[in-house]
Amino acid sequence: MLELLMSGGWLMIPIIACSIISLAVIAERFWSLNEKKITPEQLVPSIWKLHKAGQLDKAKINSLSGSSPLGRVLAAGVVNYSHGREIMKESIEEAGRQVAHELEKFLNVLGTIASITPLLGLLGTVIGMIKVFAAIMANGVGDPTVLAGGISQALITTAAGLTVAIPTMMFYRYFRGRIDGLVIKMESEALKMVEMMHGERE
């Protein structure tokens, strides 16, 4: 396997580096985008109970804000409850945008890797074919082994680039969809809390 990678030439180094970075980002995103960590169950009902009991003090709001991304969004609304429904919603939307931006962390890295690794493979193909034609000019086409190195590099780098790019793009799309779903759920929970606190929902 190592010999196969080595025969791809120096362009295998950035392709392998991209694959390692991609694997690290995918593992980190799987760990970070855990639905139970981001949108814990029963958070809105617990806020409602504290609100009805008059126990939503500054300490509990700070604790809520640090508990999860959803808690941070809801806390932004609770802090501005006394300023009316519209200000409360605006605060929630602002916090929601910040949280959504944080959830998208490293996704651009995956998108970039998915875009550049096929290009690196293509560059390897071009370099390999240049070597083939240079060998033909120097030695003719009588000895196939003279051409083997260039053809091998041309094929291996292309295959390696696509091998990294295809799963990376799949995970990029998967994480993008998961983030969209989490943002929609946070918006729904925040709206529910606003309506409950303003007496529009039980």
Question: Where do the PLM segments sit?
Answer:
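Residue-level signature of catalytic and energy-coupling elements of molecular machines
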Residues: G9, L23, A59, L74, ...
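Predominantly long cytosolic amphipathic alpha-helical stalk/bundle segments
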Residues: K37-L123, I127-V141, R173-E202
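Membrane-interfacial hairpin junctions
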Residues: E3, I136-A138, D143-A148
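Alpha-helical transmembrane segments of integral membrane proteins
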Residues: M12-V25, G111-P118, V164-T168
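Alpha-helical transmembrane segments of multi-pass membrane proteins
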Residues: I26-S32, T163-R178
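Hydrophobic membrane-targeting segments
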Residues: M1-L43
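Pore-lining and gate-forming transmembrane alpha-helices of multi-pass membrane transport proteins
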Residues: T145, G149-Y172
